[in-house]
Amino acid sequence: MAKVAWIGLGVMGYPMAGHIRKKGGHELTVYNRTAAKAQKWAGEFGGNAAATPAEAAKDADFVFCCVGNDNDLRQVTTGPDGAFSTLREGAVFIDNTTASADVARELHAAAKKKGAGFLDAPVSGGQAGAENGVLTVMIGGDEADFRKAEPVIQCFARAATHMGPVGAGQLTKMVNQICIAGLLQGLSEGLHFAQAAGLDIPKAIATISKGAAQSWQMENRWETMTNGKFDHGFAVDWMRKDLGICLDEARRNGANLPVTALVEQFYSEVQRMGGGRWECSSLIKRLEHK
């Protein structure tokens, strides 16, 4: 049984930490910016709640983190009372935040100075994947640190793959988000067209999903998109943040992402419609308002 710390108990982190406790039987100490949520988690799963990231990370073998963005990540690691102030030699810090490859490299170097490991380990599978413990985890960092942390990561994962050196996990997640953005825009236009053409939508989806157009987004989102229900899953605000990271990285590495840039702007329109917290398949809403 390992001693594990968890920082960030949002819609993803809360159940992910729960799986480590329930499936792995590990000793957990959790920290959340809203202390009441950490207390709630501790009561539900039988762990401990810490007042600061530093307190949570003290003496831990593994420290997991799932927060909002690069700045949040820096705050809970190298900021005042950050986890790195108590990160012990030989520990491994596993970051499940979708963040930039640059911040991953920065924190990997900072952890190394402490004699600790750092893995950038963003996830795919959304809230449902987190709740069911079947996330896909793409991981960058040293191979030895990955092997050490892999059994704990598997508590909430369907697949955990070492992609290469530090930053490779975040870069792979960017590929994931680029692909999803294009798929959702295409599905939005297809459904919008089918509605305008007067087609039987369920029959049309049942037919084309057996062919080359099939995708996870089609199978899991067509019905809620058609019914205008977007109160679940991954929010527009977060998707736009992720696409911004992709576009920043593309400016550095020279990749051309014309469709991604366009969809990122479409998400800004959804935000202006008041849809920042809508699920990211709500791209279809802007077509209905044109």
Each predicted region: which residue ranges?
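Helical "substrate-binding/catalytic lid" subdomain
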Residues: 167-290
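Rossmann-fold dinucleotide-binding core
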Residues: 67, 98-178
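Methionine-biased hydrophobic packing positions in alpha-helices, especially
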Residues: 12, 16, 66, 96, ...
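Hydrophobic beta-strand scaffold residues
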Residues: 28, 49, 117-119, 160, ...
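NAD(P)+-binding Rossmann beta1-loop-alpha1 motif at the extreme N-terminus of oxidoreductases
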Residues: 1-65, 91, 96-97, 127
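Rossmann-fold NAD(P) dinucleotide-binding segment
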Residues: 53-116
